[in-house]
Amino acid sequence: MANVHHISVPSKVLFQKARKLVPPMLEKFHKGQQGRVAVIGGSLDYTGAPYFSAMASARLGCDLSHVICESSAATVIKSYSPNLMVHPILPSSASVKDPSSIDAPSLASPIIAMLGRLHALVIGPGLGRDGVTLKVVTEVMKEARSRSIPFVLDADGLLLVTENPDLVKGYKDCILTPNVNEFSRLAKALNIEVPSLAQISSKESGDKTSKEAEACEKLSQALGGVTIIQKGPHDVISNGVTSIVSDLPGGLKRSGGQGDTLTGSLGTLLAWRAAYHDALWDSGEQEHSKEAENKEEVQGELESNKRMSPSTTLLLAAWAGAAITRECSRRAFKAKGRSMQASDLTDEVHESFLTLIGEPEGSKVPERL
């Protein structure tokens, strides 16, 4: 891995450090401080994906989980769970008089008005490819970026980046979660040469990961340091400066919708990350003001009791989200085998969190029976 800035930190150490990002359960907190996350997606054809993503956010532990969707999807998503706040304010061609002539900033204004109340966005689950919808979401992304609101992009949210990489280029508070096909399309759009599946498959296990990490790092660099989770047998995570691999065992069933558990988990982890950097509680770490700028400094923060800088916490949040999702998949597959569905992962989010990360010191939670 000569060209890859890969770090190797034991999973146990990473989970201990990830626990530092988790707000303890304390009487002093009020509603919303432990995370306000919104999923932007949900259309006539796709209602499951935003639900699975928003429920993963809720089950991991955010206080308020929103879905911003097209009106055609709202009632369906509401019927799935009363725990989600569903807002039918995402325009589509069916909801405007003249789809060929729209004022996208004006149509986006109801969504933009919500941004001040949110810690993180998940953009893409069930979004679809309606032209009006994508133009409106583009405006929302621009505004979120201008306000430094972190967001996760998946599915058709990634299509927007493929068509206009400048939307995220250089934005360090963004996580992309492409599968192998989405990764290839992004790489092609940015003229990044990546090894084919056949080339990767012909390599030994360690070399496969090396090739994937190198490609992931190159794509991140081309996007100016955006964090990328390249999903696969091993999840490769890179911000262009530092790369890390999530290789916990997962399930073997490749049913659709499992990536929505990842995006929702990431949404909550990004919200917790914001609370961590706002110092809403004492993490017990030594104060440390220097930003980690290279692989060695990131690894140093992860392996010490120093307070982490934003670049380190973003990489750690991405790794933790991937690890939790893999554990959800493993548990669900063990219970359901070939019949496993995306909803089975939702049921495993909390137990997976407790098994891998656990409640932080000082949390006042009831003892388990």
Swiss-Prot record:
<keyword id="KW-0067">ATP-binding</keyword>
<dbReference type="GO" id="GO:0005737">
    <property type="term" value="C:cytoplasm"/>
</dbReference>
<dbReference type="Pfam" id="PF01256">
    <property type="entry name" value="Carb_kinase"/>
</dbReference>
<feature type="binding site">
    <location>
        <begin position="179"/>
        <end position="185"/>
    </location>
    <ligand>
        <name>(6S)-NADPHX</name>
    </ligand>
</feature>
<feature type="binding site">
    <location>
        <begin position="231"/>
        <end position="235"/>
    </location>
    <ligand>
        <name>ATP</name>
    </ligand>
</feature>
<dbReference type="InterPro" id="IPR000631">
    <property type="entry name" value="CARKD"/>
</dbReference>
<feature type="binding site">
    <location>
        <begin position="250"/>
        <end position="259"/>
    </location>
    <ligand>
        <name>ATP</name>
    </ligand>
</feature>
<feature type="binding site">
    <location>
        <position position="126"/>
    </location>
    <ligand>
        <name>(6S)-NADPHX</name>
    </ligand>
</feature>
<keyword id="KW-0547">Nucleotide-binding</keyword>
<comment type="function">
    <text>Catalyzes the dehydration of the S-form of NAD(P)HX at the expense of ATP, which is converted to ADP. Together with NAD(P)HX epimerase, which catalyzes the epimerization of the S- and R-forms, the enzyme allows the repair of both epimers of NAD(P)HX, a damaged form of NAD(P)H that is a result of enzymatic or heat-dependent hydration.</text>
</comment>
<keyword id="KW-0963">Cytoplasm</keyword>
<protein>
    <recommendedName>
        <fullName>ATP-dependent (S)-NAD(P)H-hydrate dehydratase</fullName>
        <ecNumber>4.2.1.93</ecNumber>
    </recommendedName>
</protein>
<feature type="region of interest" description="Disordered">
    <location>
        <begin position="284"/>
        <end position="307"/>
    </location>
</feature>
<keyword id="KW-0456">Lyase</keyword>
<keyword id="KW-0520">NAD</keyword>
<feature type="domain" description="YjeF C-terminal">
    <location>
        <begin position="14"/>
        <end position="356"/>
    </location>
</feature>
<comment type="similarity">
    <text>Belongs to the NnrD/CARKD family.</text>
</comment>
<keyword id="KW-0521">NADP</keyword>
<dbReference type="GO" id="GO:0046496">
    <property type="term" value="P:nicotinamide nucleotide metabolic process"/>
</dbReference>
<dbReference type="InterPro" id="IPR017953">
    <property type="entry name" value="Carbohydrate_kinase_pred_CS"/>
</dbReference>
<feature type="compositionally biased region" description="Basic and acidic residues">
    <location>
        <begin position="284"/>
        <end position="306"/>
    </location>
</feature>
<keyword id="KW-0597">Phosphoprotein</keyword>
<dbReference type="GO" id="GO:0047453">
    <property type="term" value="F:ATP-dependent NAD(P)H-hydrate dehydratase activity"/>
</dbReference>
<feature type="binding site">
    <location>
        <position position="260"/>
    </location>
    <ligand>
        <name>(6S)-NADPHX</name>
    </ligand>
</feature>
<dbReference type="InterPro" id="IPR029056">
    <property type="entry name" value="Ribokinase-like"/>
</dbReference>
<dbReference type="GO" id="GO:0110051">
    <property type="term" value="P:metabolite repair"/>
</dbReference>
<dbReference type="GO" id="GO:0005524">
    <property type="term" value="F:ATP binding"/>
</dbReference>
